[in-house]
A protein has these predicted regions:
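Short beta-strand-to-loop capping motifs
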Residues: 11-15, 53-56, 127-129, 168-172
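A cross-kingdom feature marking solvent-exposed beta-strand/loop segments within repeated
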Residues: 17-20, 34-37, 45-50, 57-61, ...
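A short, glycine/Asx- and small/polar-enriched loop/turn
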Residues: 5, 44-49, 160-163
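Conserved small/polar residues in nucleotide/adenosyl-binding loops
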Residues: 175-178
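C-terminal accessory/binding modules appended to enzymatic or scaffolding proteins
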Residues: 1-34, 95-153, 163
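C-terminal, non-catalytic macromolecule-binding modules
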Residues: 53-109
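Structured core of small recognition/catalytic domains
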Residues: 149, 154, 158-173
């Protein structure tokens, strides 16, 4: 990638509550920056998720990192609910990166827009904000806390800006007209 060495990670497993939180929590704990992701849940209950993550500065052996991520993430996903309930870490292998000068001087005003889909069976949540370490993990924890189910997502990091789109559903999103 332009910013450094990265990994493409595919996760194919039976969907489970808090699976997305567990995956994002792992990446956050290891200071792996999610640059791009596609999240899909099949009608038959399987999660097919792909991520492109950047390694932190100081990580040198790409093959060793890939093997480590493959092993550790597989172990974590054996019990995604327990992994999701672990406290967010501040560190990882190489510490946390600081906010860039550009994002401090020209921050992106956070925006969130929630709209029903065409059939009104799910919702489309669009989030735009300044990128920061742990942002996607924080969003995933909010989804889990409010029992919002993630059906599909497209995650994009464009420099210091994130543009994420989530297709979600859940009982807290149901509305009634009184």
């Amino acid at each position: 990638t332009e910013q450094g060495e990265g990994l493409q990670i595919m996760v194919y497993t039976r969907d489970a509550p808090d699976l997305f939180v567990a995956i994002c929590g792992y990446f956050d704990a290891k200071s792996l920056s999610i640059q791009d992701a596609r999240i899909h849940t099949t009608r038959h209950g399987w999660a097919l998720d792909s991520f492109i993550v950047l390694l932190p500065e100081g990580a040198s052996d790409l093959r060793a990192q890939a093997t480590l991520v493959e092993h550790e993430l597989a172990e974590r996903l054996k019990d995604p609910q327990a992994a999701a309930q672990a406290q967010p870490s501040r560190g990882g292998y190489f510490g946390r990166s600081r906010q860039s000068r550009v994002s401090r001087v020209f921050p992106v005003m956070p925006q969130a827009e929630l709209q029903p889909d065409e059939r009104s069976t799910s919702w489309r949540l669009s989030v735009t904000a300044t990128d920061r370490p742990g942002l996607l993990h924080a969003l995933a924890r909010v989804f889990a806390q409010h029992e919002v189910n993630l059906l599909m997502a497209k995650i994009m990091t464009l420099g210091d800006r994130v543009e994420d789109v989530f297709i979600v559903d859940g009982s807290c999103l149901l509305y009634t007209s009184d």
